């Protein structure tokens, strides 16, 4: 269960609460992802984020780039994002399905962070279409969880469940990188091998980078 769960159940204010975590290691992980992509952004860059939620990442990046737009499937997320980002003239979020992207512009940077590639159920065809959004010389960043981060990741999802943001964790079926909740929620990840396969399929140069012992990045360059 991917896109639909986030669209129907875990959006807007609930999604905001997910990131209002008390777990310091999770806060470090979230910051490390943003810091990593920000190192490739400057004032001349145009950016698009896929699965932008309420604009958490966009708000952090907008001061460092020319413009940043996000797309998200949830109308509630988009409404909250427009309010959250209203003081940033170079930032916006629009309602759109990542599996049917109709944006006409192209960008220097494409972002799909915080395991969006898994939670949105992206297919190889989706990845090919996403690469069409990139200008020549641009870079696409996809991130998932590092296997080293399992204990902290599970603790975070347990916190979310305790706060009523997710269903109770199904401990019997949770493990080996997969978190299952009793309300039907299922969170998977991508392995380095899966990232390698997806990247090579595009025909463009790629690299796989582990960041902060918490994130695994697939970076594809349109060269």
Residue spans for each PLM region:
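Conserved class I S-adenosyl-L-methionine
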Residues: 1-42
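Class I SAM-dependent methyltransferase "Motif I" SAM/SAH-binding loop
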Residues: 51-53
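Class I SAM-dependent methyltransferase SAM/SAH-binding core
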Residues: 56, 61-99
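A short SAM/SAH-binding and catalytic strip from SAM-dependent methyltransferases
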Residues: 109-122
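A short glycine-rich, Lys/Arg-flanked "PGG" loop and its adjoining helix->strand segment in the class I
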Residues: 124-136
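SAM-dependent methyltransferase
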Residues: 141-198, 207-208
């Amino acid at each position: 269960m991917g896109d639909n769960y986030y669209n129907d159940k875990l959006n807007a204010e609930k999604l905001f609460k997910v990131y209002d975590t008390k777990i310091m290691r999770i806060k470090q992980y979230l910051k490390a992802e943003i810091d990593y992509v920000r190192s490739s952004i400057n004032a001349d860059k145009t950016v698009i984020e896929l699965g932008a939620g309420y604009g958490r990442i966009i708000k952090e990046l907008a001061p460092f780039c020319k413009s940043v737009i996000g797309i998200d499937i949830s109308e509630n997320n988009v409404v909250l994002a427009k309010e959250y980002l209203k003081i940033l003239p170079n930032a916006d979020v629009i309602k759109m399905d990542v599996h049917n992207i109709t944006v006409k512009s192209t960008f220097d940077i494409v972002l799909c962070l915080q395991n969006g590639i898994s939670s949105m159920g992206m297919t190889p065809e989706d990845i090919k279409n996403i690469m069409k959004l990139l200008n020549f010389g641009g870079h696409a960043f996809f991130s998932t969880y590092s296997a080293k981060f399992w204990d902290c990741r599970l603790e975070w999802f347990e916190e979310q469940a305790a706060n009523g943001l997710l269903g109770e964790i199904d401990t019997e079926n949770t493990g080996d990188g997969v978190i299952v909740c009793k309300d039907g929620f299922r969170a998977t990840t991508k392995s380095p091998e899966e990232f390698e396969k997806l990247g090579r399929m595009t025909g463009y140069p790629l690299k796989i980078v582990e960041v902060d012992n918490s994130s695994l990045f697939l970076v594809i360059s349109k060269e």
